[in-house]
Amino acid sequence: MLTLKIFVYTVVTFFVSLFIFGFLSNDPGRNPGQRELD
């Protein structure tokens, strides 16, 4: 159960950092299909 909790926290942290990184480096020129992921 502890391993599952660590895995969940790792995935959540990964997606949060990915979201923050994409928000800070919001460049429509590099991401032409960004509106489709909305």
UniProtKB/Swiss-Prot annotation:
Superkingdom field: Eukaryota
Compartments (UniProt record): Plastid, Chloroplast thylakoid membrane
Pfam families documented for this protein: PsbI
Keyword Isomerase: no
Thylakoid listed as a keyword: yes
Main subcellular location of this protein, as a coarse class: plastid
Membrane topology classification: Single-pass membrane protein
Any one of the GO BP annotations: photosynthesis
Transmembrane segments: 4-24
Keywords of the record: Chloroplast, Membrane, Photosynthesis, Photosystem II, Plastid, Reaction center, Thylakoid, Transmembrane, Transmembrane helix
Cellular compartments per GO CC: chloroplast thylakoid membrane; photosystem II reaction center
Protein role: One of the components of the core complex of photosystem II (PSII), required for its stability and/or assembly. PSII is a light-driven water:plastoquinone oxidoreductase that uses light energy to abstract electrons from H(2)O, generating O(2) and a proton gradient subsequently used for ATP formation. It consists of a core antenna complex that captures photons, and an electron transfer chain that converts photonic excitation into a charge separation.
Subunit text: PSII is composed of 1 copy each of membrane proteins PsbA, PsbB, PsbC, PsbD, PsbE, PsbF, PsbH, PsbI, PsbJ, PsbK, PsbL, PsbM, PsbT, PsbX, PsbY, PsbZ, Psb30/Ycf12, at least 3 peripheral proteins of the oxygen-evolving complex and a large number of cofactors. It forms dimeric complexes.
Family from the record: Belongs to the PsbI family.
Classification via PANTHER family: PHOTOSYSTEM II REACTION CENTER PROTEIN I
Protein name per Swiss-Prot or TrEMBL: Photosystem II reaction center protein I
The gene coding this protein: psbI
